[in-house]
Structures are given as structure tokens and as C-alpha cells.
Amino acid sequence: MGEMGKAIGLLISGTLVYHHCANRNATLLSLISDVLIVLLSSLAILGLLFRHLNVSVPVDPLEWQISQDTACNIVARLANTVGAAESVLRVAATGHDKRLFVKVVICLYFLAALGRIISGVTIAYAGLCLFCLSMLFRSSIRNSVLNRRNGEILD
């Protein structure tokens, strides 16, 4: 799946989460519960249907596993992200870097003021939309550069 497909999939998923959390005034926990209920019900119905039609399931979902390297990679990336944020806040809090301290204070003040005006879910959704737009923009620029290198004429 290309970067454009990832951006569109992320935008669709984010829109569904935003609709569930913001428009229905539901929590993220209720969203996770609803998703698990739908998945469980779908698997149960498919299992009954396959059993009734005497269709064998080619892959047992209980055998699906991720490798230990993949799990370690996911945890390492999460730890690096949290560690980087923690180190930036630690340096800003000690006051050794005055410019960083001012940037962090301005950013936190802006987020606090924005949080009083707009709900957190709306802010997160707007950030997701901006992120997806930047991914789509980078992908379209990359495609146009590749097309020009290949000698194709763009309209």
C-alpha cells in the first residue's frame, strides 16, 4: 500500500473515531468496546455460517501471531518517542536552554487556551487531518517528480 493509501485509510479511520467520540459524546473506551463487540459478533456469525455450509476455514485465527522482533520493534519505537518527549521537557524544565523553555511554554499555553475553546477530540482530529494532508501532498509531489524523470508530460 502506498503512502497515499495509508493517508486515506488513516483519514477514514480517524473520521470514524471522531464521529464516535465527538458527535455521539462517547468515550474511547466505549469505542474499543463497540469494535470488539462487532468483531466478536461477526466472527461468531461467520463461524456458524461456515459450519452450516460445511466450509473449512483455511487459517485458524488463534494461530495468528506476531514475531518477537516485531513486538520488540513496536515497544522500542514507543519507548524512543516517550523518551524523546521526556528529554525535551526535562531540558526545558531545567532552564538550561532558554529558547526551548520559551517554545515549550508558548506551545503549552496555546494548547491550554485551545483546549478551553475546542474539545480535545476535535483538536486531535484536526491534527490527524493536517497530518494526512501533508502525507498526500508529499506523495503527489513525489509522483510528479518521478513522472518528470520518466519523461512523461503532465497536463
UniProtKB/Swiss-Prot annotation:
Keyword Endoplasmic reticulum: yes
Claim: Transmembrane helix is one of the keywords in the record: yes
Transmembrane regions: 30-50, 117-137
Record GO cellular component, one term: endoplasmic reticulum membrane
Localisation: Endoplasmic reticulum membrane
Keyword vocabulary terms for this entry: Endoplasmic reticulum, Membrane, Transmembrane, Transmembrane helix
Topological category with respect to the lipid bilayer: Multi-pass membrane protein
Pfam families noted in UniProt: Reticulon
Residue intervals of the Reticulon domain: 1-155
InterPro entries found in the cross-reference section: Reticulon (IPR003388), RTNLB22/23 (IPR044177)
Name of this chain's protein: Reticulon-like protein B23
